[in-house]
């Protein structure tokens, strides 16, 4: 008995010692705005609390700065990478997202996000949360005296945050708000989609070509999602001409990693021309100059560019398939466009601009998307 007491005493001391030496878990705190919404059980939080994933009939909300949101919408509406009957990787001249409804929330009021990220990151996080609640139900911020803010829309089943900055400044807070209500928000971001696409492709070393303001978004996501992959964020400044800028990016990467090699470059841009970039890559392969030879040694034989539109399109298809969220309706994808504007309370609300927008834009050309198996 004495021996047993001695053993128990030693064990207790060891447990106490271990507890004293444990490093407390680092918990990221959400913004006051989320706590404010959670305290209001009659308003926005009630909408979130009663939220379901909206099932197969919900919409796919694409949220972001106008240019990125529209570019991504174009790719999603025209994507044709699989056979719609059996899911084989074979275009069948039918939209892959047939029957789906896309709500494109063009956040003109708060753009450019890079300004908010630099001056007030918490403000950008608040913008992301407010837009997500709008995607759940736009009446959350309606004003009885302002008819523009009283529109109704389909409840979102998936949230696509079409800006890399929202991965760092917003996604966590949107997810936290829904978790506080005991609900799940299905959220996609270009940062995570591109990193996971690189991992799926077997990349071991990649460069992320992104603005300095987006550095932490990629670095933090890489630590979570691709810890075994070497990820280097490279920012360039210049006159904006794409092909020389690509060479500048390679030069900076070479200075950072003198013996490094690249399986891919992730493009933090919805408008960069893959045609121009691939043409410059082929020019480098010809090794006409010493610089060409130096850069060619960096690029591995299977080097590729990974851009957000293709990565998000593939990620969305896989997600809908894995979670069985496809509508399975036999119809072309439906799309509605919304633009944020200031209401009478001095806050931003969505205003539908589908008619005006669709009449001024032609049907998008089919976009390339990566393999989805």
Language-model features: where?
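Sec-dependent signal peptide recognition
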Residues: 3-12
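C-terminal motif of bacterial Sec signal peptides marking the signal peptidase cleavage site
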Residues: 17-19
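Non-catalytic structural scaffold of enzyme domains
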Residues: 21-373
